[in-house]
Amino acid sequence: MDYVHVFVLRTLCVGEDGEIKSRNVAVTLDMFEAEDHRNNGVENGYDTFVVPGNWGDEQ
């Protein structure tokens, strides 16, 4: 079975209650795009997930 790396881009923001929250802003399969997003500011980051290549297929 093939696996795919999925990168969830996130950023920190201040919520309505004044607390700092992490917000998902995009999803990409490109590691370089994820690293570029992270390098744009200290508030940016990404999480990496490995998912089966056939995750959408019926079982």
Short names for language-model regions:
Residues 1-24, 50:
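Short aromatic-glycine-(Arg/Gly/Cys) micro-motifs in beta-strand/loop hairpins
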Residues 34-38:
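Short amphipathic alpha-helices within nucleic acid-binding modules
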Residues 39-59:
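Short, mixed-charge low-complexity intrinsically disordered segments
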